[in-house]
Structure formats: structure tokens, C-alpha cells
Amino acid sequence: MSWQEKINAALDARRAADALRRRYPVAQGAGRWLVADDRQYLNFSSNDYLGLSHHPQIIRAWQQGAEQFGVGSGGSGHVSGYSVAHQALEEELAEWLGYSRALLFISGFAANQAVIAAMMAKEDRIVADRLSHASLLEAASLSPSQLRRFAHNDVTHLARLLASPCPGQQLVVTEGVFSMDGDSAPLAEIQQVTQQHNGWLMVDDAHGTGVIGEQGRGSCWLQKVKPELLVVTFGKGFGVSGAAVLCSSTVADYLLQFARHLIYSTSMPPAQAQALRASLAVIRRDEGDARREKLVSLIARFRAGVQDLPFTLADSCSAIQPLIVGDNSRALQLAEKLRQQGCWVTAIRPPTVPAGTARLRLTLTAAHEMQDIDRLLEVLHGNG
């Protein structure tokens, strides 16, 4: 089979399963409204949970940062790309979340891959929740260590896997809020079992940071858990992009020496770091509390209105509210019908989610209003 035949066969298989991913160019897509092909839609596919992507103070901070530092960092942080803006953001994140150090990464995917690649050796073992993000599972699969997966949020299964002999160290990996189901991990129980077996805990809290807990400190703070490795991302609650790893000083020093994604990547622009500092300030003050409270009320309104629909509603109290349809083609058809009626909703299909669980992944944000939720419910009931 030639290269072209191999590529064609893979694409044909995706098409046959109604699983071919497509991109849609949008003129505006992060806020309450999405604009595409000169039409405006209510946007229920954005991860901008607090509605900060268009916040005037954050936009102004980025503009002022670009005027001061330029539009790029100019290099790796180990060469010339680590600015006083990066340093200030790291210090503010560490203070906010109660860690000694924070290290910035260009994306959450890069942060997860970097930590696992740098930390794990052949004699070690990763024990990951089966529904962990692709970046975590791919990094674990590519690492020299053994990968074992425990049933989703099943602490008993986790304990059984940790109890089996391991010549090296064990790292337990999970998420705070799961990206496709929107449910939360029982972090306190997971940490207790992990500590009983002398392991370390790594939590990816991409969908909890900024959105839940006191001052938006996220899932771990809410559950009074402090994992050895905490990954936070800035493309969701912060409304920007990028990520950070929170850890001890010695682990930070270690990652600065051995995390290749840090050493060999251009740093995020300093202007972006300035925007993130402004976003963090909003998240921490009363305005952040008000946005989180509004989001909670929107979620409650939505969940109360979908109980009698013929779909499976995931057990989620987060901004991620999946309606599980099951069949790929049915999910695609339903998403298209909703778009035709002015609601931009995305159908998520295997391999992103398990076979037979194709869904509409609805996301609610503080930028929405109650009438937006009511319109979404009206359209869903009309097509249920």
C-alpha cells in the first residue's frame, strides 16, 4: 500500500463511520455569539466559560503588552524568551493556587506531554483514569513507563492497580472536570489511595480552573486536595490560551532541566502573559465571583429544562453539558438542525468519545443570558 493509498483508506473509513472531523471558519467564535457565513448564531460550543475573551481590560492589557514587549517572545525561555511579564505571571499563579512554583507552557497539551515525558522512566508506572484527556493518555502511551488505566472515577479499581508490584515510582493521572462528560473526579479519595501506595498525583484541571472554587481556584482547591503536579490551562476560564504546571521548587527546577517542551519551544508572547495577568485579576475579584454565580444559575436553568428529552443527560454540574445521542449520524443531523435554527452546537463522535456515545457537547458561559438558555431549550424540544 502506497502512502497515498494509506491516507485515502484512513479518510474513507472516517467518512463511512460519519466520524470525519471538519473545521468551520468563523468571523467570531469565542463569545455569546458565533458569526459564520455572514450569519449570527447563539454559541454553545465555546470553552470561554467566564466570557472573558472579549473583556476590555484583558484586551487592553494585551495591547499594552504588545506595545511594551513586541508581539513575540523572541525565543525559548532558556535563551531570551523569559520576560519579567512571564515571571510575574508565574509568581501570581503560584501564590493564588498555593504552590511554590509555576511554569508556563504554550498549551495544555504541551504541558501534559512535557511533564509525563520528563518524569517517567522505564521502571515507573502511570495509572490514569480511562477518560483522561488525549494529551495525557498519548504522553503516557509514548513514555517508556508502564500505562495502566482504571475505570472512570473508580477508586477501588485504582487501589487494586496501585497495589500490584512496581519496581519504580507510580504516578496517578486524572482530570478535575472531564472534558467530554463534564463530571468531576473524586480527588480527595484518589489522593488518599495514591498516598497510601506512595505515589504522586497529577491533576489536569483545564475545565475547573477559574470556574469553580473560592476565587476560581478550581477543583483541587474545592476538594481540599493539593496534588504534587497540577496543570491549569488558560483557554477556558481565563479566556485566553496557554497553560501552567504548579509544583514544588525542586520539581520546577527538574522540569526546567529535562522538560523538552520548555527547553526547545518558543515562549508565549509577553503580551499574552500580560493579558493572562489581567484575566487572573478579574477571576480573583468580585467580578469573577459574579460571573461564576451567573454561570451556576444558567446551568441550573438548562438542566431543569432538559430532563424530559429523549437523550441521556450526563451527570454534570459544570459548564459542559453533554446530551448523549448514541448514533454518529443522528448526532450530526441534530447538530445541523440546531444550527439551522440559530444555535451553534457541535457533535462529538468517536474516537474522541467511546463508540456508541456520540453526543452534542453543549457548553454554557457567563456571556449567555437566561433567554439564550430558553431559546436553546425551545430548539432542543422541537427536535427531540
From Swiss-Prot:
PROSITE patterns in the record: AA_TRANSFER_CLASS_2
SUPFAM superfamilies listed in its UniProt record: PLP-dependent transferases (SSF53383)
Record-listed pyridoxal 5'-phosphate binding positions: G108, F109, S179, H207, T233
GO biological-process terms attached to the record: biotin biosynthetic process
Presence of the UniProt keyword NAD in the record: no
Top EC group: transferase
Keywords: Biotin biosynthesis, Pyridoxal phosphate, Transferase
NCBIfam families associated with the record: bioF (TIGR00858)
Stated name of the protein: 8-amino-7-oxononanoate synthase
